[in-house]
Amino acid sequence: MVELDHVVEEVLKVINDNGFSQKGAFNLRQNGTSICHGDSEHIKIKKKTDKPGIDIYIDGDTKGEKVYIPVVVSVSGMTDLVYNDFYIADGADVTIVAGCGIHNSGCNESRHDGVHTFHVGKNANVCYQEKHYGEGNGTGGRVLNPVTNIYVGENSVFNLDTAQIKGVDSTVRETLVEMDKNSRLYVTERLMTEGDQTAESNIEVRLNGEDSSAQIISRSVGKGNSVQTFHPKAVGNNKCQAHIQCDSIIMDHAEIGSIPEIRARDLNAAIIHEAAIGRINDEQLLKLRTLGLTEEEAESVIIENFLN
Amino acid sequence: MEDNGAKKCLLDHISFQVDDGEMLVITGPNGGGKSTLAKVLIGIEKAESGKIFLNGEDITDYDINHRANAGIGYAFQQPPRFKGMTVQRLLALAAGREMSDQECCKLLSDVGLCAEEYLNRQIDGTLSGGEMKRIEIATVLAKEHTLCIFDEPEAGIDLWSFSMLIHKFEEIHKEKKQSLIVISHQEKIISMADRIMVIDDGKIKAEGLKEDVLPCLNGLDKCHTCAGKAGVRA
């Protein structure tokens, strides 16, 4: 077992809710290098030979197993680019816990660009959890630009749960999902920005297969002078259903934009988009204050639950 | 008080007392000032003059959360919705501590909800007005208070749940000996009161023991018999 330094351990505690341990299938990447990895009976991880990154093979007998692939960047001035490809066999049932934390105590920009591609077979059930986080008292920026490509096979279910809660100065998130017959997609995106942080999220879902369905829920909170832009897009290429819901709480001098796009190329495509941006509701604050919470506590509870 | 930016006298010379374990029902026409009075008591609205005491302590300058922590529970007439917050989380916040599934289920059952179905439900637009109202009442029941204020608890609740609610008020009133102020138009609730206060046009029109005020409620202006006993201020 590889001994981890204090910074890495603390970052892992934040980005992996249930804790990271060097057991089962896992791969921990720190500052551009895989520092430890393990396979399980049904999940094998192989290092790429042509570019940085790993290939993760999840066989069809995988049932309810978790694989951890966290990334930590703790050197100021580093740009880490990684390509991770997931091959999920027919019938597999797996949870993939990713996440990236940047600890920057220096004056140079630290950046992680993760390109993740999922090849999901038929009748599979995949849950992908990704938490992004930044910390450190340096003046250098903390930048995360994830690219996620997902190909969901027939009758498969894909849950994409992403959260960027704190400390990331700039992010541009690109997500593309291609859906086959009768597949289902659930996307939950949670984002909070503060200070002068900027965040942009572009999600495109192509519902190609008959009876495919997608639900995209995006919740965000913008504080300080931060700027957020959302561009969710659902394209119905067949008989399908899609529902996009974007809710944002705006605070201080923040700026939030939501630019939806829904496009149908089939008479039986049903696609809905809802978007709302607004300040914290006064009635909510009052209710929580009548329970004994201060205004600050009430505000924090509202944000925490809204993003939960 | 300020009402839509203009100075208006919404409550005038309101003075009353609720004794330990007493149930006071405030009734009267819509727009008469009942809910405003309740909001003044919890601190949501501020009165320009006057004093409010709780157990002898002057709480006039306390803000909302201090009044809540001092022992006032308050149920909104139209409770707000919270996207992302579960029913169980709200009840825990109301109780001021973590609550087990069993404790939450008991509270929800007390207000007529099939408990287990609701614990992880979000308090959002998927809940009906009646469900919201019952959860709101459960938030007040989650903690022991010196004084509980309910603003039209019957509104939006079906008859079956209403009977359970009445039973719960009786329990708070008679067994727990908590003081209660209930704003209501509902005959069954009014008849549970120890004392009744009628507010109209921002003023107390009548106040007294239930048996003295109740007979006058249907014709307050014409009532002469109870004037002496109930202190009718026509």
Question: For each of these PLM feature ranges, what is it?
Answer:
Chain A
Residues 1, 287, 296-297:
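Sequence-level preference for short, compositionally simple segments enriched
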Residues 1-46:
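Short, Gly/Pro- and small/polar-rich lid/capping loops
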Residues 26-28, 35-286, 290-293, 303-308:
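Conserved beta-strand/loop scaffold segments within soluble protein domains that form the structured core
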